[in-house]
Amino acid sequence: CFVRNCPTG
């Protein structure tokens, strides 16, 4: 995922 693009972490 990226800096602020994770569904659950």
Swiss-Prot record:
GO terms for molecular function: neurohypophyseal hormone activity. Disulfide bonds join C1-C6. The keyword Secreted applies. InterPro entries: Neurohypophysial_hormone_CS. GO terms for cellular component: extracellular region. It comes from the Eukaryota. The modification Glycine amide is found at G9. Potentiates spontaneous contractions of the gut and also pulsatory contractions and bladder-shaking movement of the nephridia. May be involved in osmoregulation of the animal through nephridial function. This is Annetocin.
